């Protein structure tokens, strides 16, 4: 056993045990079979009471809405996460902070986009993910250019380090906002990857494949979404994270791709990605590429729990819980809209 793992439990043993206990409460296939049989959201609430969610909706007045369920699911996850973060020592504390940065990026982009469409900031802030909240959020609406956004708001946040390649005097419009989102994510993933390799050991062995997949998924999606837009091939290539399995040859091929078939051809060279593209289709009843990516992400995150004495379980738990929230909200939406034909289109976890 490596020396560092010998002392792992001194600082982190309690929290690793705690996160494994939380993971044991993730809904099983039997729970989902019960949920999809519910006729109303009140039935859904009753079924969730028999799981680890318990009475988390007990204080909500009828009629229950999907947005309330969504908010409460996030709230429960955030309470668990913050409880662990507040008791963590370095370097686990920094690792857990890294987990929150992706939500901070999403929140900044949501606020800028909403402001661009003349939405009040007071209306937008409640829509932000609580795991990515930060003090300066409500001032985002004063920024007119990426440079202002950085200098006035983000310079004192952890996102400042990821923003160096985004600073320009161009006005914030739809295209620029998407470029900022993807540039921030590229810098974030590369920094997180570097941090995990620095930690080394089992954390690096289990986290790096997860982050490599996340980087490659973004490269595939950026390429597919860029078709038919004004984004040039050169600008598109600048948005690809360089910490995935596709780097460098696969990314060079994606940069030259002109249509979906050419993207699929790139995936052919990578066995795990080839399977994902082959299993996706656009016909009724087929799984979308996004669903296939989510399924693969769940699989990678579950693998993290097979090893002990490492930090990846904290990341994996948050991502599995996030997928569980998406599943419950999907089922709730289908029940609320009486659209049961697609109610089984959730991503099972265990």
UniProtKB/Swiss-Prot annotation:
Q: What is its main location?
A: membrane
**GO molecular function terms listed in the Swiss-Prot or TrEMBL record:** proton-transporting ATPase activity, rotational mechanism
Its localization reads:
Membrane; Lysosome membrane
Q: Give GO BP annotations, semicolon-separated.
A: apical protein localization; cellular response to increased oxygen levels; cilium assembly; eye pigment granule organization; heart looping; intracellular iron ion homeostasis; left/right axis specification; melanosome organization
- What keywords does the record list, in alphabetical order? Cilium biogenesis/degradation, Hydrogen ion transport, Ion transport, Lysosome, Membrane, Transport
Q: Which domain of life is it from?
A: Eukaryota
Q: Which GO terms describe its cellular component?
A: early endosome; lysosomal membrane; plasma membrane proton-transporting V-type ATPase complex; proton-transporting V-type ATPase, V0 domain; vacuolar proton-transporting V-type ATPase complex
| SUPFAM superfamilies referenced in this protein's UniProt entry, alphabetically | V-type ATP synthase subunit C (SSF103486)
- Topology versus the membrane, per the UniProt entry? Peripheral membrane protein
| Quaternary structure and interacting proteins, as annotated | V-ATPase is a heteromultimeric enzyme made up of two complexes: the ATP-hydrolytic V1 complex and the proton translocation V0 complex. The V1 complex consists of three catalytic AB heterodimers that form a heterohexamer, three peripheral stalks each consisting of EG heterodimers, one central rotor including subunits D and F, and the regulatory subunits C and H. The proton translocation complex V0 consists of the proton transport subunit a, a ring of proteolipid subunits c9c'', rotary subunit d, subunits e and f, and the accessory subunits ATP6AP1/Ac45 and ATP6AP2/PRR.
Q: What does this protein do?
A: Subunit of the V0 complex of vacuolar(H+)-ATPase (V-ATPase), a multisubunit enzyme composed of a peripheral complex (V1) that hydrolyzes ATP and a membrane integral complex (V0) that translocates protons. V-ATPase is responsible for acidifying and maintaining the pH of intracellular compartments and in some cell types, is targeted to the plasma membrane, where it is responsible for acidifying the extracellular environment. May play a role in coupling of proton transport and ATP hydrolysis.
Could you identify this protein by its name? V-type proton ATPase subunit d 1
Q: Which organism is it from?
A: Danio rerio
